[in-house]
Amino acid sequence: MSLDTAEKQKLIENHQVHPTDTGSVEVQVAMLSKRISKLSDHLQGNIHDFASRQGLLKMIGKRKRLLSYLKDKNVQKYQELVKKIGIRG
């Protein structure tokens, strides 16, 4: 499940570190989280879509690695991002 341009732009604006930022860890995690939630909704109704399930697991793994990296580099930003996105507790 991909995001349309307007959704991507809104996520980038909400999570960017500076005006031209499109690839920081915060932006990447926000985009992955949105894609994960859309794909999870899709899988609720399409239980036997195993290809999408595999893609979901890959996205979850990538988000986990990015969050781990951010936590190692800057715990304060990590905590703010987790709270803002609403994941992990």
UniProtKB/Swiss-Prot annotation:
PROSITE patterns: RIBOSOMAL_S15. GO terms for biological process: translation. Residues 1-23 are annotated as: Disordered. It comes from the Bacteria. InterPro entries: Ribosomal_uS15, Ribosomal_uS15_bac-type, uS15_NS1_RNA-bd_sf. GO terms for cellular component: cytosolic small ribosomal subunit. Residues 1-18 have a biased composition (Basic and acidic residues). Disulfide bonds: none annotated. Keywords: Ribonucleoprotein, Ribosomal protein, RNA-binding, rRNA-binding. SMART domains: Ribosomal_S15. One of its GO terms (molecular function) is structural constituent of ribosome. HAMAP family: Ribosomal_uS15_B. NCBIfam families: S15_bact. PANTHER family: RIBOSOMAL PROTEIN S15, BACTERIAL AND ORGANELLAR, SMALL RIBOSOMAL SUBUNIT PROTEIN US15M. Belongs to the universal ribosomal protein uS15 family. One of the primary rRNA binding proteins, it binds directly to 16S rRNA where it helps nucleate assembly of the platform of the 30S subunit by binding and bridging several RNA helices of the 16S rRNA. Forms an intersubunit bridge (bridge B4) with the 23S rRNA of the 50S subunit in the ribosome. Part of the 30S ribosomal subunit. Forms a bridge to the 50S subunit in the 70S ribosome, contacting the 23S rRNA. This is Small ribosomal subunit protein uS15. It comes from Prochlorococcus marinus (strain AS9601). The gene is rpsO.
